[in-house]
Amino acid sequence: MTTARPAKARNEGQWALGNREPLNPNEEMKQAGAPLAVRERIETIYAKNGFDSIDKSDLRGRFRWWGLYTQREQGYDGSWTGDENIEKLEARYFMMRVRCDGGAISAAALRTLGQISVDFARDTADITDRENIQYHWIEVENVPEIWRRLDAVGLRTTEACGDCPRVILGSPLAGESLEEVIDPSWAIAEIARRYIGQPDFADLPRKYKTAISGLQDVAHEVNDVAFIGVNHPEHGPGLDLWVGGGLSTNPMLAQRVGAWVPLHEVPEVWAAVTSVFRDYGYRRLRSKARLKFLVKDWGIEKFREVLETEYLKRPLIDGPAPEPVAHPIDHVGVQRLKNGLNAVGVAPIAGRVSGTILLAVADLAQQAGCDRIRFTPYQKLVLLDIPDDKLDEVVAGLEALGLQSQPSHWRRNLMACSGIEFCKLSFAETRVRAQGLVPELERRLADVNRQLDVPITINLNGCPNSCARIQVADIGLKGQMVDDGEGGSVEGFQVHLGGSLGQDSGFGRKLRQHKVTSDELGDYIERVARNFVKYRGEGERFAQWAMRADEDDLR
């Protein structure tokens, strides 16, 4: 009788276990040359010699660490999406992402963002659901001048993309909200100062998303690491630590570590969590390299043990969980601030603005004495410090720009990714489609809009990567090519229903074989919204209703 040998553990490329040999092309690229070092080549070689001079490993790899992706070549529908068509899909222009840690900028910075758009990006500008600004049509020759202008107002594109710490989400009303438990602005600024652009964390296994807020207004459940305000019964205000969230093709909600962290320790604890990811994260398969996979395999108890014993060298303080919220906190509308002034939050459709609009908003802000502008994780824009005697003027001025502070449910609660207009991964048009879909829904569902006392969130994404968080929307729409009924395929969406964060956190449900074409979106959303109003129970939220509703009412 022979005894079977135990299976040898697969090498997942974990540095802490001595596995430094790169196991995929992306890891090979990083080992061959530090991605952050490409900035010098951009400034001294590529910007001078043009697009054709760019080395492919820089173009498709290291450029990301400076917020640059090539955008999609025009004229190719979703049937062309895929790595095998990269040579056709790769345009000679770039998407550039500007990170705004905490979503916070000054009026001067907003003006600079607007002018860069007008001068170099064909007047494009989109507010993302990570509080960034994204440009399109950027030429490599203009990148050094754009960087110079951003540097002058305290903004940067450093690590806005790539396997590194992305922009840090923060509350748009941090320090001024009457509802926040604590103002963590110092921690956000300190993490950005100490660690962003530094080599220690510039080579992580995969992207790494952070959210820090005294309110639950940053979608913390879908971030790799998050600190959320909570009151400890003995120690007072602090932050509750969460790890391992993320969506894409394997969605997972973050888990509570069960630790209360005082404000002054947040940067240290953030660095320790990031170090665990850097050293133990999986580097073999890109599709399983996010922190969430390590947390899932280890379990939260082991994660906390390693964090405390190997990195912090001390135990964390046990703490209570924050009370989950019923609905997204998007800061749209007029709110009174701690300082006695007002915040005005507005809802551009799916975050789409323009350089011209940003310049006009900067004018309005400066005329009202406002020097604090915020972007939100829901693709919204907020102006702080508006005095009472300027409030009507600012609200009217924003309204004239198409930026409503009292929008319909459909305008307020719809988000979208870049879509096939610019993204090489997309199968469907999303942000552009949203510009027509929202007015259509406002016309068709004006009566429902008046009846609704709860939001219905609608998130459009062009591919499975879920940049627009489809799995946690009431109605999530994932772009794909769908059967046209005549043996061909057309642009369409797979439907996810009843996803939510907060009280009903979860990914909802998919209906078997249920897909809609892009042309059917208005009809489908109207049908489901009317069924919700007709069949919901007293006080019932959409996510609750969708989980119990008959399939026929959801189709």
Curated annotation (Swiss-Prot):
The keyword Heme applies. Siroheme binds at C467. The keyword 4Fe-4S applies. Its EC number is 1.8.7.1. Keywords: 4Fe-4S, Heme, Iron, Iron-sulfur, Metal-binding, Oxidoreductase, Thioether bond. It catalyses: hydrogen sulfide + 6 oxidized [2Fe-2S]-[ferredoxin] + 3 H2O = sulfite + 6 reduced [2Fe-2S]-[ferredoxin] + 7 H(+). There is a cross-link at Y69-C161 (3'-(S-cysteinyl)-tyrosine (Tyr-Cys)). It is an enzyme of class 1 (oxidoreductase). Catalyzes the reduction of sulfite to sulfide, a step in the biosynthesis of sulfur-containing amino acids and cofactors. Monomer. Belongs to the nitrite and sulfite reductase 4Fe-4S domain family. This is Sulfite reductase [ferredoxin] 2. It comes from Mycolicibacterium paratuberculosis (strain ATCC BAA-968 / K-10).
